[in-house]
């Protein structure tokens, strides 16, 4: 669109924005073609349940976001449309999945290893009796 002649149907000031919008739509179209090239069942069979939930949530969020953009292009305020509540609901579930993922990644305490580490890391001074016995043993040799 950069080499094309500017259409007089809209103000020149928004030409860059329209070009960027058109490029973004093209990128979304390519991404969706890639996602749609594999059947949903085929894709989900390869994933564990948490990954399946992520795919479902991203798909739902993408679809609703695209509807948001559609409403905006039609002159409808999407902030006053039920799609806003749907996007918020999906965002809440995405946060729940993120919390679960973070808990799985969090370090777990190995009590045995921690106990050995602390026991060996703490320095204990030898008692006076033990050092006298050690000195007597050295002098007799």
Swiss-Prot record:
Residues 100-141 are annotated as: Interaction with NCOR1 and NCOR2. The gene is C1D. There is a cross-link at residues 119, 126, 132 (Glycyl lysine isopeptide (Lys-Gly) (interchain with G-Cter in SUMO2)). Ubiquitous. Expressed at very high levels in the hippocampus, medulla oblongata, mammary gland, thyroid and salivary gland. Expressed at high levels in the fetal; lung, liver and kidney. Expressed at low levels in skeletal muscle, appendix, heart, lung and colon. Pfam families: Sas10_Utp3. Keywords: Apoptosis, Cytoplasm, DNA-binding, Isopeptide bond, Nucleus, Phosphoprotein, Repressor, RNA-binding, rRNA processing, Transcription, Transcription regulation, Ubl conjugation. This is Nuclear nucleic acid-binding protein C1D. One of its GO terms (biological process) is apoptotic process. Induction: By gamma-radiation. It comes from the Eukaryota. Plays a role in the recruitment of the RNA exosome complex to pre-rRNA to mediate the 3'-5' end processing of the 5.8S rRNA; this function may include MPHOSPH6. Can activate PRKDC not only in the presence of linear DNA but also in the presence of supercoiled DNA. Can induce apoptosis in a p53/TP53 dependent manner. May regulate the TRAX/TSN complex formation. Potentiates transcriptional repression by NR1D1 and THRB. Its main location: nucleus. GO terms for molecular function: DNA binding; nuclear receptor binding; RNA binding; transcription corepressor activity. Belongs to the C1D family. Monomer and homodimer. Interacts with NR1D1, THRA, THRB, NCOR1 and NCOR2. Associates with the RNA exosome complex. Interacts with EXOSC10; the interaction probably mediates the association with the nuclear form of the RNA exosome. The homodimeric form interacts with TSNAX following gamma-radiation. Interacts with RAC3. The keyword Amino-acid biosynthesis does not apply. Phosphorylated by PRKDC. The lineage of its organism: Eukaryota, Metazoa, Chordata, Craniata, Vertebrata. GO terms for cellular component: cytoplasm; exosome (RNase complex); nuclear exosome (RNase complex); nucleolus; nucleoplasm; nucleus; transcription repressor complex. It comes from Homo sapiens. Residues 1-100 are annotated as: Required for transcriptional repression. Residues 50-100 are annotated as: Interaction with NR1D1. It is found in: Nucleus; Cytoplasm; Nucleus, Nucleolus.
